[in-house]
Amino acid sequence: MKIAVYGKGGIGKSTTSCNISIALARRGKRVLQIGCDPKHDSTFTLTGFLIPTIIDTLQSKDYHYEDVWPEDVIYKGYGGVDCVEAGGPPAGAGCGGYVVGETVKLLKELNAFYEYDVILFDVLGDVVCGGFAAPLNYADYCIIITDNGFDALFAANRIAASVREKARTHPLRLAGLVGNRTSKRDLIDKYVEACPMPVLEVLPLIEDIRVSRVKGKTLFEMAESQESLNYVCDFYLNIADQILSCPEGVVPKEVPDRELFSLLSDFYLNPTLSEKENTLSPSSLDFMMV
């Protein structure tokens, strides 16, 4: 099974991807996570350091694939998850899609691409140009990471459009949305009502998820010394269980941009009476007292 993870830049794709990879490994699966970002930091919380990229390794070998060994590019991460970083072209030059293609080509040359139960592509930001949409060519499922905000859901809608386009020629389906670090899901629910798709999970708004990235650890590793985090790990295990059940998935029909803009902005500009009441804080009530 191959999964491509997309979402708005900075939404927490890599942190979420790493924890999903660990959850899949905890379910007894052999997992490979491939970082598809020029920053090459996708697998940082799994390995604890920035591993060399495929492109760096190929350049050092003058692109002689026969001189590259699996241990040159595949690094063992926490929980037994194998890690690869594709890297990227120089800034302002080249194509990220080419880099992804070269990565898959090399892994096939090394007979590694088909050795895993699950391969997870963690893809750069919300860029859905032909280049960075390349992982969708190999994926069985796409997962979109979002939060309960306007920008993230707008990006999710554009990614959904890419999934629909790729599904014309590939056996690709959208597994669903994952809400990351959000205390509410009302705007998410409003979006999936307009663009039907599963919501796999909504992760709680806790600081430890963000801090784990800085520490270079997954929530599962942090939970070894902080038992209070075990309940957070259960969220990722639930996502893993849903993925491993081979869900039917959907081919989404994205909402037209102007219609979505109106839908999401109206949610903020014209909230219902109950929503207005919920937004009143104790401090604002103090000012209203006579």
From Swiss-Prot:
Gene Ontology process terms (BP): light-independent chlorophyll biosynthetic process; photosynthesis, dark reaction
Cofactor note as given: Binds 1 [4Fe-4S] cluster per dimer.
Alphabetical list of InterPro entries matching this protein: NifH/chlL_CS (IPR030655), NifH/frxC (IPR000392), P-loop_NTPase (IPR027417), Protochlorophyllide_ATP-bd (IPR005971)
SUPFAM superfamilies for this protein: P-loop containing nucleoside triphosphate hydrolases (SSF52540)
Transmembrane segments: none
Domain of life: Eukaryota
Subcellular location: Plastid, Chloroplast
Binding site for [4Fe-4S] cluster: 95, 129
Residues that hold ATP according to the record: 10-15, 39, 180-181
Catalytic activity: chlorophyllide a + oxidized 2[4Fe-4S]-[ferredoxin] + 2 ADP + 2 phosphate = protochlorophyllide a + reduced 2[4Fe-4S]-[ferredoxin] + 2 ATP + 2 H2O
Named cofactor requirement(s): [4Fe-4S] cluster
Residues holding Mg(2+): 14
Gene Ontology MF, one: 4 iron, 4 sulfur cluster binding
EC numbers for this chain: 1.3.7.7
Pathway the protein takes part in: Porphyrin-containing compound metabolism; chlorophyll biosynthesis (light-independent)
UniProt KW keywords: 4Fe-4S, ATP-binding, Chlorophyll biosynthesis, Chloroplast, Iron, Iron-sulfur, Magnesium, Metal-binding, Nucleotide-binding, Oxidoreductase, Photosynthesis, Plastid
GO cellular component: chloroplast
Record function comment: Component of the dark-operative protochlorophyllide reductase (DPOR) that uses Mg-ATP and reduced ferredoxin to reduce ring D of protochlorophyllide (Pchlide) to form chlorophyllide a (Chlide). This reaction is light-independent. The L component serves as a unique electron donor to the NB-component of the complex, and binds Mg-ATP.
Family membership: Belongs to the NifH/BchL/ChlL family.
Subunit structure comment from the entry: Homodimer. Protochlorophyllide reductase is composed of three subunits; ChlL, ChlN and ChlB.
Designated name of the protein: Light-independent protochlorophyllide reductase iron-sulfur ATP-binding protein
Originating species: Chaetosphaeridium globosum
